[in-house]
Amino acid sequence: ARNLDPWLMTSKGVLKSFVSNSDADISVTEGVMGYFDGFSGNSNFSSTYHVANITRSPVLLVLDASKTARSIAATALGFVKFHKNSRIVGLILNKLGSKKHEDMCRAALAPLKIPILGCIPKNPDLSLESRHLGLIPAVEQDDLKQKITKIAKTLVPYLDIEKIISIAHKTGPISSTIKISKEKAKTTIAVALDKSFNFYYYDNFDSLRRNGAKIEFFSP
């Protein structure tokens, strides 16, 4: 996993990171905050929408359907119409209370003709622990892989996986040139890496290595 941050990396850096780490059938980019939330209240800069534009990615908008039914259509329409090209190609409804609740949301959304690619019921097991600064780091969760596997298996029946894959395959090719140094490592850089020091942008390490550095990790 990598961080795509236009604020620190610039659009060019985001594209380079995305392309160089996309050696897979499908690349999934998870947004943070609200879809259009970025640098300021009157700019999309550094928002998830901004990143989607840089990478030319189709967007699946996940909506919290708890405590709403017909109003969810107004929310979805607002996101889609906020910009001429919102890049939103489908919806996933989350935290549904019942089949009746799902049917009400579907009925409200039907006139918008936005594909609904998933309807996920409320389930406390479909969450990862968090605290005031965000999710608990992976290094502090010994059973994280097992949790993710369990969540994935639970979600499969509620998602239109084939349609999601089809949307991903319709995206056009993108490319970015990355210069790789052929010189041997000239400098060794020590980096603290353990349970206390673990939040890094790994593209920084890649950049250092491309420019002749050898990274040595240690625990203080």
What is each model feature region?
Residues A1, D103-A110, N204-L208:
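Short, aromatic/basic amphipathic alpha-helical patches
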Residues A1-T55, L63-R87, K99-D103:
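ATP-dependent carboxylate-amine ligase catalytic core
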Residues V28-E30, L60-V62, D64-A65, I92, N94-G97, A190, A192-K195:
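Structural motif
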Residues T55, L112-K113, N211:
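Short, structured coil segments at secondary-structure junctions
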Residues V59-V62, L117-C119, E216-F217:
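Short hydrophobic alpha-helical runs that function as membrane-insertion/retention elements
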Residues A69-S181:
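Internal gly/pro-rich beta-alpha loop/helix module
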Residues A185-P220:
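Phosphate-binding active sites in nucleotide-utilizing proteins
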